[in-house]
Amino acid sequence: MLEKNYDAASIEQRIAKKWEARGAFKAGMGSKSAAQSFCVMLPPPNVTGSLHMGHALNTTIQDIVVRFQRMRGKNVLWQPGMDHAGIATQMVVERQLAERQEPTRQEMGREKFVERIWEWRYETGGVIANQLRRLGVSCDWSRERFTMDDGLSEAVREVFVTLYKQGLIYRDKRLVNWDPKLLTAISDLEVEQKEVKGHLWHFRYPLEGKLFDPSDATTFITVATTRPETMLGDTGIAVNPEDDRYRNLIGQNAILPLVGRRLSIVADAYANPDEGSGAVKITPAHDFNDFEVGRRNNLRLINIFTEKAEVFLHENEAFFEGVVLSDALKMLVKDLDQKDRFIARDQIVSLMEEKGYLVTVDDHPHTVPYGDRSGVPIEPFLTDQWYVNAAELAKPAIEAVHQGKTQFIPDSWQKTYFNWMQNIQPWCVSRQLWWGHQIPAWYGPDGRVFVEKSEEEALNSALSHYGEVVNLTRDPDVLDTWFSSALWPFSTLGWPNKTPELATFYPTSLSVTGFDIIFFWVARMMMMGLHFMGEVPFPTVYVHALVRDQKGAKMSKSKGNIIDPLELIDQYSADSLRFTLAIMAAQGRDVKLDPSRIAGYRNFATKLWNATRFAQMNGVKHDPDFKPEKAKLALNRWILTELSKTVVAVTTGIENYKFNESASALYRFIWNTLCDWYLELLKPIFQGSNEDAKNEVQACTAWVLDEVYKLLHPFMPHMTEELWSLTETLGMKREDMLALIQWPEASFSDEEAASDINWLIDAVSAIRSVRFEMNIPAAALAPLVIVEGGELTLKRVELYESLLKKLARVETISFSDKAPALSAQMILGEAIFCLPLGQLIDLEAERARLMKDVSKIEQDIEKLSAKLSNPKFIENAKPEIVEVERNRIVELRTAQKKISLALERLV
């Protein structure tokens, strides 16, 4: 007999250990001979990371699909692993060194520091893998990989060297996102855009050949900027070619204030006539948009910052080129050189104002890019880096999606993919870090580069080139973390070696991802997979939405609304969290996670637990001879028909990645059909003396429960596995753990029996609803009068009269030609069911109560309607508050309709 209460905490831990001891998730487990392979690559979480709600949704979706395919007999591999997370890991270890007052990274040296990181990785890194286990993910943990392990490192070197020798990797001087605190280039994903209350400075730039006069607009052009500190690197001014104000100035020159550099005035659509003054100063070396304008118009690039974002003027040849070194300029250089960029900003603005160049300063809220780890503003910085020719690699990746070789679900993300890929820029793959894949490039004494897989090969290449042995210096930079992640679908399977796993599982079957890394990860896996394997890495990309808080707000530390999945697991169980995420995971719709919903689905799990316990208490046991098609009782044939429909709904939902539809179908069947109706309808049989009927319902119930455990298993794996194990004693030994049992088939249908029982359920539900609406006392037995009932209704009443009376609290059932006066009427198929109300309630008192209720609701609706019609409320209130009020008015109108219907029944 099951315990009275389901103890999720202890059971989930025990079941997880049983799965691992059984090796239930190893590739090939549960598969049939010559089975079709099915492979999913777990997006490798950062080794520094901990489980968040995005992980929980992502891995729950994957696990549902993986468990489903495993139960269908496929040769399944869900490949787990972790990412070395370059910047994040290096920062964690550096912080640890500082806290322990140990030598710094620089004092320790590269080799010892990297050794220290490896120690940290083995001691405390990878906590997230154990957290994922708590969620119940069924990865093949015996194959866990790490992006820095030997095999993957070999793959990284192979790819880098191959691309270099194909001319697809090269070194170039371009703008990058530069973190002046961490002193490295970072990816766009590591940049956080923050809204700041900044300023827009309007400056007068003198026109060449004109005597500057602040009061004479013909002697200058006004430019607007949010970054005065970068003006030292200006090399041009852009105006829109359609802007009549400046058309006559196109092709002329202005003079850079304070410096004296000649600036070309160029026509470029980048300049917006409606923003600022319409004229934009162009600093190609310190702004990404300006870089493109400069490239289109052949403007010089002058870098005026150091790696630490300090002003760099002294010994800056590019800065002095073409300008007269006056005493004023010498003084400027002396005052600003080596100053922090923001200190320099204040000094430059003061000088511009002092010399009459400042027009005005406007308050100007705008976004500023910050490093998400360093917390300092990012600087577009001109530096030498390694780049991948992403545009060339993107061509086949674009074509593959056009041809349908890879599809996005929802398909709206395909447009986003094309937009990114068709406008792709060179991919900066070098990082100024110590932790990561060190770039396999060595430099000769004259700066010539030798790119090889090993130092020995590089020395041999250098010997061939120079004709003598020379010393080589290795490039100190490491590769962008996304470089190794892009190889994940084939490097984890043993590439560049031709392994059986590679032959079996590549291409993989599915990629599940958040929309924020379609470009950073999915697109790059597409490019690398096609280039090195000749096939797309996966035919399907399922893009899930964001998990937001219950009000629909994005979760963030600053808002204090982050929901910790581990706390939810502790409080409600992993299965309850998983089912909640699944049932809310509608395609293209963000998940608004309300803990009360998780509590509700914990109750759902309890409902099934109690149903199984109820079955045990009533002698339910397996009968090896039971076959659905042999069932005789209409109740059993009905539940078997409804079960088959549920099998179809759940299977179709998972196959089409509509997990919410599958979960909803399971919820309806288990809670309503099975527990509320089938088991309730069985009670008279359990309590009766008809042994044949009792034996059949006992065997059928055991069979149906088994099928339910199987269907629910991908969503709630722990509890279903426990129930599967504990119900083994009901007369049948289990052939294996539930995780490895065959998925159910929809093999039964009896629509006549289903129609009859559903009629009974509809009749009972309708009568119960009227009793509730009309406030009929629960103890009162009501007479039921049936009008216009034909042969079908007569037959059904004869078959199910006793059940109808018991469940609907009906005293007598009679047939009549017309409805009794003052009766509540319900239409059921061909007949009208009538409850004479005068015999059951005080009509006048009930009418007064309902009138009072409806009056209060109408007042509330009027107030809310006025509130929602007020533009100021809509404009000033938080969006989630507006949404709450809109939902409230919908609820009130629904209640209003119900009460109005009840009043109509009293007429």
From Swiss-Prot:
One GO CC term, this protein: cytosol
Family annotation (InterPro entries) = aa-tRNA-synth_I_CS, aa-tRNA-synth_Ia, Anticodon_Ia_Val, M/V/L/I-tRNA-synth_anticd-bd, Rossmann-like_a/b/a_fold, tRNA-bd_arm, tRNAsynth_Ia_anticodon-bd, Val-tRNA_synth_C_sf
Q: For this UniProt entry, what is the primary localization, expressed as one broad class?
A: cytoplasm
Query: Gene encoding it?
Result: valS
Reproduce the free-text note on domains from the UniProt record. ValRS has two distinct active sites: one for aminoacylation and one for editing. The misactivated threonine is translocated from the active site to the editing site.
Q: Does the keyword Aminoacyl-tRNA synthetase apply?
A: yes
Question: What is the reaction catalyzed?
Answer: tRNA(Val) + L-valine + ATP = L-valyl-tRNA(Val) + AMP + diphosphate
- Pfam entry (one): tRNA-synt_1
Does the keyword Transmembrane feature in the UniProt annotation?
no
Function of this protein? Answer: Catalyzes the attachment of valine to tRNA(Val). As ValRS can inadvertently accommodate and process structurally similar amino acids such as threonine, to avoid such errors, it has a 'posttransfer' editing activity that hydrolyzes mischarged Thr-tRNA(Val) in a tRNA-dependent manner.
Enzyme Commission number: 6.1.1.9
Assigned keywords, A-Z: Aminoacyl-tRNA synthetase, ATP-binding, Coiled coil, Cytoplasm, Ligase, Nucleotide-binding, Protein biosynthesis
Q: GO annotations under biological process? A: valyl-tRNA aminoacylation
- Residues at which ATP binds: 557
Q: What is the lineage of its organism?
A: Bacteria, Pseudomonadati, Pseudomonadota, Alphaproteobacteria, Hyphomicrobiales
Broadest EC class assigned to this enzyme: ligase
The identity of this protein, by name, is: Valine--tRNA ligase
Quaternary structure, per UniProt, is: Monomer.
Q: Motif 'HIGH' region at which residues?
A: 45-55
Coiled-coil region: 838-870
Q: List the NCBIfam families.
A: PRK05729.1, valS
